A protein has these predicted regions:
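Conserved segment of winged-helix/HTH DNA-binding domains
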Residues: 53-78, 91-98
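N-terminal helix-turn-helix DNA-binding core of bacterial DNA-binding proteins
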Residues: 1-20, 48
Length: 137
């Protein structure tokens, strides 16, 4: 759908992405309500992006599907307060949100479809450590 000009049906999208149709239907409905996709009825039924893929970021999609990029105990970081020795933990959560924004607001649907990431994202991906999962010792 990212690079397609013709509407794509929900069934075709589900098959293409290996997702259950009902699950994808919920996602498409959320994306439609957020103004990321538009739906078409009738002979040309299906979905299209509401604006060019180069203008839709992963942050837009995540916010449409999940809400805020970062939450702490169900709260936005700026409203999560801590006491005593943990009082500066809020600063850490706000920094986490800023880091997520720095990446997710610079990756567009077009870049995901083509694999051509923004330089700041490509630099992060070039670090071999970025590809290593970390686990508790």
């Amino acid at each position: 759908m990212a690079m397609a000009h013709e509407p794509m049906t929900a069934d075709a999208l589900a098959t293409d992405q290996g997702l259950p149709g009902k699950f994808l239907g919920v996602i498409l409905n959320d994306l439609r309500r957020a103004g990321i996709v538009v739906s078409h009825r009738g002979r040309e039924a299906g979905y299209n992006l509401a604006r060019p893929a180069s203008q839709i970021t992963l942050a837009d999609v995540i916010r449409a599907l999940e809400g805020p990029l970062a939450q702490v105990r169900g709260l936005r970081p700026e409203t999560a307060t801590y006491q005593g020795a943990a009082k500066h933990l809020q600063d850490a959560w706000i920094a986490v949100r800023a880091s997520l924004r720095a990446v997710l607001e610079h990756i567009t649907i077009e870049q995901v479809a083509t694999g051509e990431m923004a330089p700041e994202v490509a630099q992060l991906l070039a670090d071999p450590d970025a590809w290593v999962a970390r686990r508790l010792a």
